[in-house]
Amino acid sequence: MAHAQELTPEALAGLRERYRRERERRVRPDGTRQYLGADAEFGFYAADPWAGESDVREPVRDRVDVAVVGGGFGGVLAGARLRQQGVARVRVVEKGGDFGGTWYWNRYPGIHCDIEAHVYLPMLDETGYVPEWKYAPGEEIRRHAMRIAETFDLYTDVLFSTAVTSLSWDDTTGEWIVETDRHDAFRATYVITATGVLSELKLPGIPGIERFKGHTFHTSRWDYAYTGGGPDGGLTGLADKRVGVVGTGATGVQVIPKLAEDAGQLHVFQRTPSSVDVRANRRTTARDVGADRAGWASERRDNFLRVVSGEAVEEDLVADRWTATAGLLEKLLPSFRRPDDLAAFEAAYEVADAARMNDIRARVDDLVTDPATADRLKPWYRYACKRPTFSDLYLQAFNRDNVTLVDTADTHGIERMNERGVVVGDTEYPLDCLVFATGFSVGVSGVHSGRLPVRGRGGVRLRDAWSARGPRTLHGLTSNGFPNLIQLGGVQSASSVNHTHVLDEHAVHGAALVAAAEAKGAVVEPTREAEDAWIATLAEHAPDHAWFHAECTPGYYNAEGRGRPNGPTAYPHGAAAFHELLRRWREESMDELLAPRARVRAC
């Protein structure tokens, strides 16, 4: 393995050139347009395989205090934090058949979370639950979302198998009208949107995809009726099948070992290899994590956030590969900025990055027996160009006689499909089943994309209000002209690799806003001046990431090779500082976000 001190200027120059060549092999002129949505003729890919037949019910026409759009962790946390604030009439609307969000939909074989369960699963202190595994399987995570909902009585008023189709502010009554695909039209004083950033599955736009006569499905709607087995494997229905899988990101890294165990033949179609580090999962006990202490989970979660944000701590409580590479993770977070010599920092960072990636590539050689296959599995890009993955099974799966790796980089993916299978280059691969592990339209909620129309004061659409100059918010949560609308997990806030922590802080803040508005008979709405000040704060310290992502291999981090824009898109000082800012705001400045309910004009 190459270490930092062995990386000469010549070696670094060679790496840069290799990274450039590998990037050029994969960049497509159509960018993000290469993907299809699961609608129109492809709508069957998004059908709910878990809910069964929807209950027949009459349309809902009543009124609640708060409508929460989305029943994933964001929505569950919003409901729970509202309950803690004493809000009684809370209704969650969720298109799935139960709580869980992405963990409701994704139940594919091998699914786990890559963040330690004791920091990823929220409200462990409040529910008294201690995770069974360091990295929890999907079923444990989904059941915890349900546990929170049960603990805080969210099942009392919930509309499952129901999608919100529009949110409209009534200027006359000062309420939101919530309409759904089941003809509901109820009213709410407040709306909290928690539609998530992993909710819209995507498919590869392969020419002829509709011609294939075999079986197909997306990993987020796994078809166990066809494959047999369950999340732990045992896919006996594939024993005599020729199976293909498209996608080798976080989902593919988990599902491919399970498919390899049970499929008659498995073809893995890979455009870009993931970086695959050690997982080292294990069962855990309450004693392992100090769960006998009050507040243990919050302490551990805060400790993890500080470590991956590059802050100094007395002890790294989680002590895993995320925290070990904390210095590199600063590139993933908007906290990266140095007041001193930026050029010197970048040079040192490049050396550390190269050493880390050399170690990851060396691990491929250690675990994959065929040199040609090993070479195709090596990630030739910088560490933060793609979300890292972790597995102790994935690379070894390619040593099996029934597994074939098909490199599609030079053809920019699968070239076409026909009735029999897929075509790459001059080779046709006949298949009985093709699994799409192609992920989601990451980072774009239904509200921001316009798929969920939101109309505020005077009927102005949120998307139209933001079309000219981009998003306008205070803290990423509230917007002028859209009173009593609180958006969780949105732009212009802070991000973290542990997304549930961010969602929980948003939920705590949103619930506090609702409680304060109720106590004062006010509406939650920032002034335009408050928005301007917040955007100026973001812009003043906005990090220059555009050059970095423009040089990365294509993926969802950089809009498939287009780079990411600079500007006020996220809080620049990191999630830990942002959470502290929200706490101070609640203590000192809450009244600045409250306006008299009688106000009907934007100020």
Curated annotation (Swiss-Prot):
Keyword Oxidoreductase on entry: yes
Spans traversing the lipid bilayer: none
Pfam families assigned: FMO-like, NAD_binding_8
Keywords noted in UniProt: FAD, Flavoprotein, Monooxygenase, NADP, Oxidoreductase
Cofactor or coenzyme needed: FAD
Residues annotated for FAD binding in this entry: 94, 102-105, 114, 120, 164
EC number(s) stated in the UniProt entry for this protein: 1.14.13.-
Highest taxon above the source species: Bacteria
Broad class of enzyme this protein falls into: oxidoreductase
Binding site for NADP(+): 112-114, 248-254, 271-272, 386-387
Site (Transition state stabilizer): 387
Alphabetized GO MF terms: flavin adenine dinucleotide binding; N,N-dimethylaniline monooxygenase activity; NADP binding; oxidoreductase activity, acting on paired donors, with incorporation or reduction of molecular oxygen, NAD(P)H as one donor, and incorporation of one atom of oxygen
PANTHER family cross-referenced by the UniProt entry: FAD-BINDING MONOOXYGENASE AUSB-RELATED, L-ORNITHINE N(5)-MONOOXYGENASE-RELATED
Family: Belongs to the FAD-binding monooxygenase family.
Function (record text): Catalyzes a Baeyer-Villiger oxidation reaction, i.e. the insertion of an oxygen atom into a carbon-carbon bond adjacent to a carbonyl, which converts ketones to esters or lactones using NADPH and/or NADH as an electron donor. Thus, can convert bicyclo[3.2.0]hept-2-en-6-one into the oxidative lactone products 2-oxabicyclo[3.3.0]oct-6-en-3-one and 3-oxabicyclo[3.3.0]oct-6-en-2-one. Is also able to catalyze the sulfoxidation of methyl phenyl sulfide (thioanisole).
Stated name of the protein: Baeyer-Villiger monooxygenase
Lineage: Bacteria, Bacillati, Actinomycetota, Actinomycetes, Kitasatosporales
